[in-house]
């Protein structure tokens, strides 16, 4: 497995994120894409406006391969897991098309593939032993699972 980090030079708008995810998942070697960025909470957590709703223009629902995904963050980085190196150039071309303001594409190890102590504390030993390896590194142990992970099924009809 090959891991790529796509680091755009600006936060991405919801439409750009949606375009990137739909295009990336259309490639046959893309196994998973993890998005990371600044959280957009539902309510203001502190200050004079504490408790009032956050009405951010980029807090939207996007559709990735027909699956609705509530975007609760401003995407600042994407990690792409590939089966092999054959489509790295296609990912680079996609980034050139969608990110005219610039980006950095790095090949390396960004996602963990073995359970950590936090996983054992959060889920328990029996759950960690039976967990789907795709879920490792997909969520923060302090977060509520249903709110932080959205599984997008990989269809058999991928284009090259």
Curated annotation (Swiss-Prot):
InterPro entries reported in the protein's UniProt record: Me_CoM_Rdtase_D (IPR003901)
Organism domain of life: Archaea
Sorted alphabetically, which keywords does the UniProt record give?
Answer: Methanogenesis
Q: Name one GO biological process term.
A: methanogenesis
Assembly and interaction partners:
MCR is composed of three subunits: alpha, beta, and gamma. The function of proteins C and D is not known.
Write the protein's name.
Methyl-coenzyme M reductase operon protein D
User: What gene is this protein a product of?
Assistant: mcrD
């Amino acid at each position: 497995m090959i891991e790529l980090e796509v680091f755009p030079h600006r936060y991405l708008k919801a439409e750009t994120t949606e375009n990137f995810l739909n295009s990336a998942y259309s490639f046959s070697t893309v196994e998973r894409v993890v998005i990371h960025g600044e959280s957009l909470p539902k309510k203001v957590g502190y200050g004079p406006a504490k408790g009032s709703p956050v009405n951010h223009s980029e807090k939207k629902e996007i559709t990735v391969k027909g699956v609705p995904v509530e975007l609760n963050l401003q995407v600042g980085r994407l990690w792409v897991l590939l089966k092999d190196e054959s489509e790295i150039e296609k990912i680079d071309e996609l980034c050139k098309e969608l990110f005219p303001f610039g980006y950095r594409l790095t090949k390396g190890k960004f996602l963990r593939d073995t359970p950590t102590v936090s996983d054992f504390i959060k889920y328990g030993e029996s759950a960690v032993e039976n967990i789907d390896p795709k879920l490792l590194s997909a969520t923060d142990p302090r977060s509520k699972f249903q709110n932080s992970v959205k599984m997008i099924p990989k269809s058999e009809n991928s284009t090259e």
